[in-house]
Regions:
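Alpha/propeptide regions of enzymes that mature by internal proteolysis
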Residues: 1-184
């Protein structure tokens, strides 16, 4: 395995974008999109806590259904946790908006939210942000880095990584981004 330059856009066929939708923050990006040009297998490791945020419940449903994923929409600033049925409904609204903007199935849209717990998502800002993200997405390394920055809350730096490995005699690139509260 060898580390290569980039993050979520390092692998062929993956695009990303970021935007400042005004979810919570002013004058900084707070939404990111990761998009796969083709539907792909999705897997997840989820909390075992009885309290789960709406996006966790949504993503568990998507993964359990066996649907192929094609997009991940993430917002920072409001976690959409402890928001009840309304918060889960906003996940459906988010998936529907992404499906329409990207011309894909809503069943293949994963959602991530990070930030303040117990506050409802401003869904109008979120769906408007999705339209912007869809228009800005591309496969540049810069867009991947900007997406990693957009999901930060109290993080001190964006976290992204890409590696190349040999599988069956072919080189495969895997890219990703992550966030963590107060990460050093």
């Amino acid at each position: 395995m060898k580390q290569v330059k980039g993050g979520v856009t390092a692998a062929k066929g993956f695009e990303a974008a970021s935007t400042a939708a005004g979810i919570k923050y002013k004058d900084r990006t707070d939404m990111a999109l990761v998009y796969s040009q083709v539907p792909c297998v999705a897997a997840g490791t989820f909390t075992t806590n009885v309290v789960k945020a709406a996006p966790v419940k949504w993503d568990q449903q998507v993964v359990k259904s066996g649907a192929k994923a094609q997009a991940v929409v993430v917002n920072s600033g409001i976690a959409n946790a402890c928001t009840g049925a309304e918060g889960f409904g906003y996940c459906k609204d988010t998936a529907d908006a992404a499906a329409k903007a990207l011309n894909i199935s809503a069943d293949g849209v994963l959602i991530g939210s990070t930030g303040v717990i117990g506050k409802q998502i401003p869904i109008d800002k979120l769906t408007a942000g999705i339209k912007v993200l869809a228009g800005k997405k591309n496969d540049t390394l810069e867009n991947g880095t900007e997406a990693a920055k957009a999901i930060m809350t109290t993080d001190t730096f964006p976290k992204e990584l890409a590696v190349a490995i040999e599988v069956g005699g072919k080189t495969v690139t895997i890219g990703g981004m992550a966030k963590g509260s107060g990460m050093i």
